[in-house]
UniProtKB/Swiss-Prot annotation:
It comes from Limosilactobacillus reuteri (strain DSM 20016). Pfam families: BRCT, DNA_ligase_aden, DNA_ligase_OB, DNA_ligase_ZBD, HHH_2. The gene is ligA. CDD domains: BRCT_DNA_ligase_like, LIGANc. NCBIfam families: dnlj, PRK07956.1. InterPro entries: BRCT_dom, BRCT_dom_sf, DisA/LigA_HHH, DNA_ligase, DNA_ligase_AS, DNA_ligase_CS, DNAligase_adenylation, DNAligase_N. This is DNA ligase. GO terms for biological process: DNA repair; DNA replication. The active site is at K127. The keyword DNA repair applies.
Length: 680
């Protein structure tokens, strides 16, 4: 967002219309990254500033408001594999203010409300940096946990919630209530998790909020249980059921019922008390064991809360005061460039270490050459750092008054820092790119991508191992992974018999993956995991795809010309053709093993929801899943009321118990094997 924007009141209708369209697109993209992908690319205050601009534009030009505007929506879509849950009472997001003056204006508007008499008594609470959580109890027993989702439809995370120690499975009273709050990851647990992932060669989480969201939304509750999540509950929508009249009383009552409630709430009555609370926790935020990104102010009287009601998106009875980003000055000592998997060459500022929001910071991404030129960052400059989302260091501005007299504009490199090839700007891109397919940096990043969970899922093969394999010249491309042997792996640092056997098994198992994993793992530009599945479901095998032209690929629903042209260009490269031949030689599967749209419509499995649990003896779980999907079944990870059949092998656990409690049809392996024979 530019700081030189024309004031909204000075814009014509056409000018406002021209600004609103790209602004909505930008906010929609950022919102999708934050809510659906748990992977924000901009810091909160950048999003907030853009969002406030859109609010102002729509207030000034109400004829431009549309139902699909980000101002009219709550949260994000719910596109994961988790079961969907409808919220009986919508879970709305909060409005934001960014200064004491804006907060006082909000309170003044409340008290001037012509229809509702608002007493100036507020309950202040810390705004926990996590994700919203709903817990539903029937007769005192936990029956459902869900995320906010889009405010109306959330995701069922009941099994995962049961692994969180601070969530009571049963209340001391037989109440039927919904309790809402925040699921978060403590700072210590976040640091521990990222250290573990880094040691295993896995990508680290950008911040505790993303880590909490990713952990709570796991398909496997065992993963959630290992992540040390915690909760603070703060709201009972139907407060009459717990016999309270104020928000402060509601918090106390939740504590009595066994919920974890943040102890730092305070009832206030005037500006001085509000300012004191904000100043107190602005100073203390770095010392807390959990992340906060602001203060929440709520009308304390709950009947008044109901009378004030909500807008289409936010409550009128509460508001979030967002902390301004903390800044520190430091000096840029160098600018280094790194090469990514797709050839993107990214600059990073190396600076004198400074303490920022509780951690030592000495590096910050400069994103791309345009960003570097726009901010005119130079070696020797004094710059101001803040943390995007309180986590990611970013340069906010250059102090030109301290720029050295002999300073010269930074010269953007023209050659790849790793392989020395000429760097290029591709049409429509801001990034510099190395287009040498044999660039070592790209190959190593590509190997890590190939082995990643959503690609070939080679457990234990992270960047640290890949670096060693490369340095010892044991691999040069992904096909080389399948030629590794026992003796070669034993030469790696910290590799013994067990780790060697485990990695070889993992590599060998990956040969049998369905081909969409291979297509995604090849790292073709613009081809994500979802697109790879759609494409391979259509073509059935890799050879058919390689023979297709761009028009045929582009015509597939949900694909389009950008992906089609990218795939054809990729497979036209003779080095790629050679690599595919090598993968074929080492036995990597080229066929689509999932359910295709041409599955037999008369199959008794067609359209059925099936859960596999326990150990199978006559086949692997993967083989059973592939057979079911080939016959039209939908194989899911969790048991719900929508599940049709649970196939239970030996040592089946909680899924079997849940299926029996829900009255779902349970088959043993012998019944399933017989059904497979009859289907033939």
């Amino acid at each position: 967002m530019s700081e030189k924007q024309t004031p909204v009141k000075e814009l014509t209708l056409q000018e406002a219309q021209d600004e609103i369209k790209p602004l909505r697109a930008k906010l929609t993209k950022w919102g999708k990254e934050y809510y659906e992908q748990d992977n924000p690319t901009v810091e909160d205050h950048v999003y907030d500033r853009a969002y406030q601009r859109l609010v102002q534009l729509e207030e000034q030009f109400p004829q431009l408001v549309s139902a699909d505007s980000p101002t009219q929506r709550v949260g994000g879509a719910t596109e994961s594999q988790l079961t969907k849950v409808r919220h009986e009472i919508p879970m709305l997001s909060m409005g934001d203010v960014f200064s004491i003056e804006e907060l006082m204006d909000f309170n003044q508007r409340q008290q001037e409300n012509r229809d509702v008499e608002v007493e100036p008594e507020y309950n202040l609470e810390l705004k926990i940096d996590g994700l919203s959580l709903s817990l539903v109890y029937e007769n005192g027993k936990l029956v459902q946990g869900s995320t906010r989702g889009n405010g109306t439809i959330g995701e069922d995370v009941t099994a995962n919630v049961r692994t969180i120690k601070s969530v009571p499975a049963e209340l001391p009273e037989p109440l039927s209530i919904e309790v809402r709050g925040e699921c978060y990851m403590p700072k210590a647990a976040f640091a521990k998790l990222n250290a573990k992932r880094e040691a295993e060669g896995l990508p680290v989480f950008a911040n505790p909020r993303n880590a909490a969201a990713g952990s709570l939304r796991q398909l496997d509750p065992k993963v959630t249980a290992q992540r040390e999540l915690d909760t603070f509950m703060y709201y009972v929508p139907e407060y009459q059921k717990i016999g309270v009249k104020t928000q402060a009383e509601a918090l106390d009552r939740m504590r009595e019922l066994g919920f974890n409630v943040n102890p730092n709430n305070r009832v206030v009555h005037n500006r001085d008390e509000i300012e004191k609370y904000i100043e107190e926790y602005t100073a203390q935020r770095d010392k807390l064991t959990y992340g906060i990104d602001g203060i929440v102010e709520k009308v304390n009287d709950l009947d008044t809360e109901v009378a004030l009601g909500n807008t289409v998106k936010v409550p009128r009875w509460e508001i979030a005061y967002k902390f301004p980003p903390e800044e520190q000055a430091t000096i840029v000592r160098d600018i280094v460039w790194t090469v990514g998997r797709t050839g993107n060459v990214t600059p990073t500022a190396v600076m004198d270490p400074v303490q920022l929001a509780g951690t030592t910071v000495s590096r910050a991404s400069l994103h791309n050459p345009d960003y570097l030129r726009e901010k005119d960052i130079r070696i020797g400059d004094t710059v101001y750092l803040h943390k995007a989302g309180d986590i990611i260091p970013e340069i906010s501005k250059v102090d030109l008054t301290k720029r050295p007299a002999d300073s010269v504009e930074y010269e953007i490199p023209t050659k790849c820092p790793v392989c020395g090839s000429e760097l290029v700007h591709l049409d429509g891109e801001v990034a510099l790119r190395c287009i040498n397919p044999m660039c070592p940096a790209q190959i190593k990043e590509g190997l890590a991508h190939f082995a990643s969970r959503n690609a070939m899922n080679i457990d234990g093969l992270g960047p640290r191992i890949i670096e060693q394999l490369w340095d010892k010249e044991l691999i040069h491309d992904v096909a080389g992974l399948y030629r590794l042997n026992h003796d070669q792996l034993l030469t790696l640092d910290k590799f013994g018999e067990k780790s060697t056997a485990n990695l070889l098994t993992s590599i060998d198992n990956s040969r049998n993956n369905s081909v969409e994993r291979l297509l995604f793992g090849l790292g073709i530009r613009h081809v994500g995991a979802k697109a790879a599945r759609i494409i391979m479901e259509h073509f059935g095998d890799l050879d058919s795809l390689m023979k297709a032209d761009a028009d045929e690929i582009s015509a597939i629903s949900g694909i389009g010309p950008t992906i089609g042209e990218s795939i054809v260009t990729y497979f036209a490269n003779q080095q790629v053709v050679k690599l595919i031949d090598e993968l074929r030689e080492v036995g990597v599967n080229f066929a689509y093993l999932g359910s295709r749209s041409n599955a037999n419509p008369d199959s008794e499995w067609n359209g059925r929801r099936v859960v596999l649990t326990g150990k199978l003896t006559e086949m692997t779980r993967g083989e059973a899943k592939s057979w079911l999907e080939n016959h039209g079944a939908k194989v899911t990870e969790s048991v719900s009321k929508k599940t049709d059949i649970v196939i239970a092998g030996a040592d089946a656990g909680s899924k079997l118990t849940k299926a029996q409690n829900l009255g779902i049809d349970v088959w043993n392996e012998q019944q399933f094997s017989q059904a497979m024979k009859e289907e033939q």
